[in-house]
């Protein structure tokens, strides 16, 4: 039977601001990425998200981003790799504290937004992220964009397990990278198209680029976004689609 991990970014509320559909999404995913306070989230939200994830037996990962709350971590920052290392180490350590306090064990690290996209094409950024993981806990998995040589090489250098990720509701360029969110066609808004794309990636190992070309994708985890208007409905549909197609949802080891 084909197996796949379903992951989702959660814990993005902070202070008086409520974001996402965390409680409703949790039953349909096998791993989550928790915002660590830089691009979203706050200490109380981090604790609550960890506790809820443990109740659902969902794998917990850190979701470090740039210190850009106003831009939700989606804006590139021109900082040296040494600062990226510091940012990532700091955020992993913060979440790990909450996970340990709740009696759990952290599973992975997935960079957020601009940090993720920069790492996918910039070996120095990817190296800084992998090095931070290695220094704090080399058993943590690294979630990174499928086919990214930067992620692959960084994981190999530090002997970290890379979990190659694809996206259910994002479009792809011909080189296998994600279409920038600044482009109108960055998101797949039609639910049927997104379901079709996910099945193609999981069952057939490819995705159609925005130019209509087939791009090979060997995905081990699929990212769902939990903050959209129909996010819960979409998560439920993907979950049931996988069941109907004999695709087992499970956490990567």
UniProtKB/Swiss-Prot annotation:
Family note: Belongs to the LamB/PxpA family.
Gene Ontology terms: biological process: carbohydrate metabolic process
Claim: Nucleotide-binding is one of the keywords in the record: yes
HAMAP family in UniProt: PxpA
Annotated EC: 3.5.2.9
Biological source species: Bacillus cereus (strain Q1)
Self-association and partners: Forms a complex composed of PxpA, PxpB and PxpC.
Signal peptide, first to last residue: none
Gene3D superfamilies the UniProt entry points to: Glycoside hydrolase/deacetylase (3.20.20.370)
Catalysis performed (reactions): 5-oxo-L-proline + ATP + 2 H2O = L-glutamate + ADP + phosphate + H(+)
Role summary: Catalyzes the cleavage of 5-oxoproline to form L-glutamate coupled to the hydrolysis of ATP to ADP and inorganic phosphate.
UniProt entry keywords in alphabetical sequence: ATP-binding, Hydrolase, Nucleotide-binding
GO molecular function: 5-oxoprolinase (ATP-hydrolyzing) activity; ATP binding
Name of this chain's protein: 5-oxoprolinase subunit A
NCBIfam families: PRK05406.1-2, PRK05406.1-3, PRK05406.1-5
Enzyme superclass (EC): hydrolase
Taxonomy of the source species: Bacteria, Bacillati, Bacillota, Bacilli, Bacillales
């Amino acid at each position: 039977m084909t197996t796949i991990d379903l992951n989702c970014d959660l814990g993005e509320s902070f202070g008086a601001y409520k974001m996402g559909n965390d409680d409703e999404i949790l039953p349909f995913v096998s791993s989550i990425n928790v915002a660590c306070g830089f691009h979203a989230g706050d200490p109380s939200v981090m604790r609550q998200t960890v506790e809820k994830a443990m109740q659902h037996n969902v794998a917990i990962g850190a979701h470090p981003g740039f210190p850009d709350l106003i831009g939700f971590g989606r804006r590139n920052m021109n900082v040296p790799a040494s600062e990226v290392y510091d940012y990532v180490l700091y955020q992993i350590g913060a979440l790990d504290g909450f996970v340990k306090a709740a009696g759990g064990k952290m599973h992975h690290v997935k960079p957020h937004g601009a940090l993720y996209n920069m790492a996918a094409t910039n070996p120095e950024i990817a190296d800084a992220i992998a090095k931070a993981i290695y220094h704090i806990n080399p058993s943590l998995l690294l979630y990174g964009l499928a086919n990214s040589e930067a992620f692959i090489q960084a994981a190999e250098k530090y002997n970290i397990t890379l979990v190659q990720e694809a996206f259910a509701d994002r479009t792809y360029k011909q080189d296998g990278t994600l279409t920038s969110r600044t482009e109108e066609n960055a998101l797949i808004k039609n639910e049927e198209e997104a379901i079709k794309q996910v099945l193609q990636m999981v069952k057939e190992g490819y995705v159609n680029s925005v130019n209509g070309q087939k791009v090979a994708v060997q995905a081990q985890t699929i990212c769902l976004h939990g903050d959209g208007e129909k996010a819960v409905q979409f998560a439920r549909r993907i979950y049931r689609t996988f069941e109907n197609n004999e695709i087992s949802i499970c956490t990567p080891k």
